């Protein structure tokens, strides 16, 4: 049974009134058969890994890893594949863009990197990972380079340009390069995620930097941001909006979130906003790209072991696009891209409702028999003394189990979870 419930709980014995208005439930438009048929992109029989976005004209290029789960995440080596889109609704597959190396080569796996245009060519700086190298006394992760004239056909130049892990840093955690042009200093800046050598449990995760005038000769400049907060930094990103620079990382912890810092200078200091994350535990490894004034965050939502909500999160899953915007105070927020929101037909409207429950939880059904893919929009007002309110959907008719968004007013937060959990 697929239903939507409105629910409310009082705070102690105070009266609790929740008003729900302007409610609409809208089903997904049908798509052309030549494109993927899911709103959130995932190539058939693969799981979407780290994404290295680029943009040209009105097209976003999603260079990304495809995990085959043979027999498990990271089981079968992968390179980078490519899909393009102009609206994050319709995708066109371009196949393999950067193939993996052999089992004997450094880039047995093509780990994350970045794509950019400079010096009359397109460039990829990527992480070559060989899982067998540590037992041979070699660094498992080395930065490598490839070039292209058309974004589709790439030539590896690893015999000309490599970045080996520097002394004092972990040779097996040295990855995810990201390159920008520093206009102020007239040089290229490359940052990557790493950690200090030593026990993996120590909070020595950091972003380090290299600089170059010509993309060929690089100088190691040490730490870019080393806050001592995380065991590892992954997928670093740098971009500027107005007067502010922003540095994003994906952090290693039980939280596994994307966090950001902001500064008026690439030299810091890097300030932590009150809300420094873009999403929760189940959205990871995002990079951004700005095309025609629209900056998109390209991250993935992980699967869980055995597709069981009670299982552990796994690496890779499904791509979800967030649009990044800047608030008046310089902090960042994310929202659904307009093209995704507008990919739905005008749908069913519901009557406004009021839930008045002074002593106990109360529910009211908003919609019966929704499809498995829809958008929902409503204005919600609540009275002083309301403890929480929420929305439940996809209810199991026999057990009463469902998913829910629960807004806990007392704690000033909301959760997405199963109910009961």
Where are the predicted features?
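Secreted extracellular polysaccharide-interacting domains
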Residues: 238, 355-373, 400
């Amino acid at each position: 049974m697929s239903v939507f419930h409105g629910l409310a709980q009082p705070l102690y014995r105070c009266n609790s009134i929740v008003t729900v208005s302007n409610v609409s439930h809208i089903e997904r438009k049908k798509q052309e058969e030549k494109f993927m048929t899911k709103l959130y992109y995932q190539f058939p029989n693969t799981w979407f890994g780290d994404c290295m976005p680029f943009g040209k004209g009105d097209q976003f290029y999603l260079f990304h890893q495809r995990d085959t789960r043979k027999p498990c995440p990271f089981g079968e080596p992968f390179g980078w594949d490519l899909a393009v889109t102009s609206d994050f609704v319709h995708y066109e597959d371009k196949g393999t863009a950067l193939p993996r190396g052999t089992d004997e080569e450094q880039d047995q796996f093509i780990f994350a990197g970045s794509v950019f245009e400079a010096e009359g060519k397109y460039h990829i700086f990527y992480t070559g990972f060989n899982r067998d190298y540590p037992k041979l006394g070699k660094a498992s992760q080395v930065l490598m380079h490839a070039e292209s004239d058309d974004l589709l056909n790439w030539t590896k130049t690893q015999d000309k340009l490599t970045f080996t892990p520097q002394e004092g840093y972990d040779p097996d955690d040295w990855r995810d390069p990201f390159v920008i042009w520093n206009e102020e200093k007239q040089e290229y800046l490359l940052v990557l995620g790493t950690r200090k050598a030593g026990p993996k449990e120590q909070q020595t995760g950091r972003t380090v930097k290299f600089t170059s005038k010509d993309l060929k000769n690089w100088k190691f400049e040490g730490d870019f941001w080393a806050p001592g907060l995380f065991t590892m930094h992954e997928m670093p990103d740098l971009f500027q909006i107005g007067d502010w620079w922003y540095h994003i990382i994906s952090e290693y912890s039980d939280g596994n979130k994307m966090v950001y810092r902001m500064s008026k200078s690439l030299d810091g200091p890097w300030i932590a906003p009150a809300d420094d994350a873009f999403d929760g535990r189940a959205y990871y490894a995002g990079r951004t790209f700005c095309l025609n004034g629209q900056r998109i965050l390209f991250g993935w939502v992980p699967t869980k072991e055995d597709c069981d909500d009670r299982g552990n999160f796994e690496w890779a899953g499904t791509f979800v696009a967030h649009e990044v915007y800047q608030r008046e105070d310089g902090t960042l927020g994310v929202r659904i891209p307009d093209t995704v929101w507008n990919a739905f037909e005008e749908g069913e409207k519901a009557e406004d409702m009021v839930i008045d429950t002074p002593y106990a939880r109360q529910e009211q059904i908003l919609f019966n028999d929704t499809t498995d893919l829809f958008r929902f929009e409503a204005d919600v007002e609540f009275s002083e003394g309301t403890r929480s309110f929420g929305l439940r959907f996809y209810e199991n008719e026999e057990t009463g189990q469902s998913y829910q968004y629960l807004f806990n007013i007392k704690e000033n937060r909301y959760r997405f979870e199963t109910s009961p959990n």
